[in-house]
Structure formats: structure tokens, C-alpha cells
């Protein structure tokens, strides 16, 4: 099959690689129909990690189940599925407690967790390919309605929307509160949308890329362009001198100062 293969910093290639195969009876093989590029894929692409050449990128995946292991009960060949980016077993104590990111079966010592196509997160191939092996398929495959009408919407469920939503969970957003979202990339926009779903009264999205701020406005948020001045001052002016009740950082360690220098250790408080 064809797959996107990492060759080294800022170098990838579409190459022929071996087709994935059923290894365990709980596996399925999915034919990929949509896969997204994550900002964390770019971390590897830019050489910010110790990713080894040969890795296939892609942890935001969906597609059609093509082959099913004998131990799989909840999905069958032909099902459309979306695949949450974090691989987990579904039956350990942590998974049963809803803490699948800390799966006791998948998270081997010395790893950051389990994910498709990511350095240090297990032996799972990425989905920027024609086919993908999915372990523990009863837990890691989310069945979808038939048809392609909402293909682009469902692709957001693999990572982008739940990551944005989780940020509002961590922030504790409650109905009627005001919220500031720093960063209007895909995750930041989904954080703003999630805050809206949670009933936030006003949502401010800080960025300086015009089309991203336009998208924030389309979602019902109030765009704050930091090229126009201190974003904190702009927000407090809009709130009669008060700050927001909640905030979320959708920029991460690539946050930069006004000078353009990155400050990876900066924490918003």
C-alpha cells in the first residue's frame, strides 16, 4: 500500500510499504477514507522530536472496516468507523474508569501513551496510508452512520473536536460564564465551539490570522486580533475591566513572545 513516510526533518515521501495484517484476534484492518494532519505531526516533521525515519504519520483517522479478527464483536466488515487517536484496551481499571489515556495494557513503561503513528507512543502504524491495523477494535472503533454526507464532520471526532472539548472540561466552563481561547487553529476553534455548547455567555478567541479569526466569528465567538494591541486589555475593555471566568491555551509549547521567539515553558495562569 501507499503511505506517508517520515524520512527526516522536513522531509516526507509517499512510498510503498507492507500492508497491515491482523496480528491479534481483537484487531481489525480499516481502509482509510479520511485522515487529518495534526499540529503534533508537524512537530515530528520539523524535527522537534526524536522520531526515527520510516515512521508513518497519522493519528486522526476514519474509514471502512475491511477485515475483522475472530475476537471482535462490535464492528463488522463494511462498517464506517472513526478512530480516536489514543489507543487503549477498554478493559483495564483505568479504561473502565474513563481514563483511557492512562491505559494499563497499552501504555508501556517509558512511553507517553498509545497512539497511531507517533514517536514514543507504541508500535502502532499511522493512518496517513491506505490501510491501518486497529488493535482492541471493540474499544477503538466508533461506528458511524452509513454514507459519506458527513465525512468531514466525523473526521473531527478522531482528535480535533474532543481535544478542544476536553480543554473546556479542564477549564471547568459553566453556563453563563465568559471564556478566552488563546489560539484559533483547529483545536482552538473547537474549544470555542465547545464553550458555546456548554452555554458560555461570551467567548473571546485570540489570534492574528485573519481567516482564522473570521472562522471564530462564524462560530459565534468574538475575535481578538493581538496585532491590534494587548489582547488582555482588549478583553478587559470588552468586559468593563474584568477578565474572563475561564480560559484555555490552544497554542502549546510553540507559544511566542511579541518578538517572535518561542517560549515552550510558558504556562498561562
What are these regions (language model features)?
Residues 80, 130, 143-229, 233:
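Mid-domain Rossmann-like dinucleotide-binding core that forms the NAD(H)/NADP(H) cofactor-binding site
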Residues 42, 96-116, 120:
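Iron-sulfur (Fe-S) cluster-binding segments and ferredoxin-like electron-carrier domains
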Amino acid at each position: 500500500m501507499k503511505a506517508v513516510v517520515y524520512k527526516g526533518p522536513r522531509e516526507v515521501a509517499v512510498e510503498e510499504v507492507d500492508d497491515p495484517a491482523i496480528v491479534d484476534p481483537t484487531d481489525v484492518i480499516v481502509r482509510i477514507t479520511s485522515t487529518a494532519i495534526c499540529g503534533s505531526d508537524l512537530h515530528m516533521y520539523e524535527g522537534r522530536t526524536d522520531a526515527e525515519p520510516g515512521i508513518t504519520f497519522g493519528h486522526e483517522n476514519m474509514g471502512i472496516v475491511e477485515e475483522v479478527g475472530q475476537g471482535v464483536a462490535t464492528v463488522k466488515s463494511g462498517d464506517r468507523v472513526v478512530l480516536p487517536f489514543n489507543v487503549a484496551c477498554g478493559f483495564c481499571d483505568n479504561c473502565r474508569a474513563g481514563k483511557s489515556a492512562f491505559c494499563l495494557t497499552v501504555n508501556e513503561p517509558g512511553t507517553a501513551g498509545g497512539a497511531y503513528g507517533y514517536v514514543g507512543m507504541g508500535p502502532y502504524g499511522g493512518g496517513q496510508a491506505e490501510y491501518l491495523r486497529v488493535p482492541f477494535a471493540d474499544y477503538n472503533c466508533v461506528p458511524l452512520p452509513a454514507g459519506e454526507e458527513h465525512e468531514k464532520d466525523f473526521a473531527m471526532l478522531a482528535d480535533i473536536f474532543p481535544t478542544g472539548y476536553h480543554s473546556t472540561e479542564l477549564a471547568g466552563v459553566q453556563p453563563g460564564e465568559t471564556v478566552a481561547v488563546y489560539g484559533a487553529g483547529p483545536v482552538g476553534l473547537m474549544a470555542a465551539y465547545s464553550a458555546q455548547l456548554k452555554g458560555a455567555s461570551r467567548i473571546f478567541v485570540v489570534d492574528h490570522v485573519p481567516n482564522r479569526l473570521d472562522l471564530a466569528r462564524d462560530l459565534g465567538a468574538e475575535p481578538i486580533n493581538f496585532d491590534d494591541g494587548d489582547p488582555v486589555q482588549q478583553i478587559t475593555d470588552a468586559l468593563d475591566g474584568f477578565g474572563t471566568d475561564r480560559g484555555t491555551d490552544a497554542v502549546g509549547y510553540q507559544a511566542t513572545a511579541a518578538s517572535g521567539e518561542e517560549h515552550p515553558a510558558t504556562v498561562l495562569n
